[in-house]
Amino acid sequence: AYSDTPARDNFAGDGRTVQYREGLYVGYRYHQTAGVAPAYPFGFGLSYTTFAYADVKATPQGVSLTVTNTGARDGAEIVQVYVAKPDAKIFRPAQELKGFAKVQLAAGESKRVTVALDDKAFRYWNTMTNAWEVEGGSYEVRVGASCEDIRLTAVVTVAGTGAPNPYEGKSLPHYTSGKVQNVPDAEWETLLGRPIPDDTVKIDRNMTLGELNHSRSPLCWLIWNPLCRKSSCMP
């Protein structure tokens, strides 16, 4: 339901600005990090056959594994590769999709599948350096049939860029937990690094009828209210 999404309180914005308080936590990245179970997980699909995954090998440049069609019918499987860093110092989703491959298999057939990982697989945007950076250390490369159906996991070590942690010493409990519904203004401003923009508008010849709603002037409200009711933008 829409009420279960992290953007429920901020989208669509009706002012001059739209606040994306959910940050990185969109779709499955929110559901998995915050522990919210959807009806169907990201990547889920049905098939007339079944598949087994085995013999995973991974490096920072890619992952390979053997996929076997264990059913009685021919079929296709989409192998999905997720990357996670359980000991991350930078807040991030529990795991993120970084690659996938579709493989066609006859009944009983096995194939070796390779999914490449590029330089974007481990990086994050650092607001202090204004550049893409990599947090060094161990990462889990998870292979599965959906974000919830992880079949194999391998650990790789990735060299970091040594950038400072832009969130060190900052209180961001909603973002570190991924539970980004109802983020308070103070925490949002801490992450934003500046005050929340004021949506009130100055009355001048360039303002639109829609902006009358955001003026502090009672006169603007008197004009806007009947117009909005007439156009059914208010109940």
Residue ranges and their predicted role:
Residues 72-89, 95-97:
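Short acidic, flexible loop segments centered on an aromatic residue
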Residues 71-75, 107-109, 148:
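Short flexible coil/turn linkers enriched for glycine and charged/polar residues
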Residues 61-62, 110-112, 151:
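Intrinsic-disorder/low-complexity, polar/charged segments enriched in Ser/Thr/Lys/Arg/Asp/Glu/Gln
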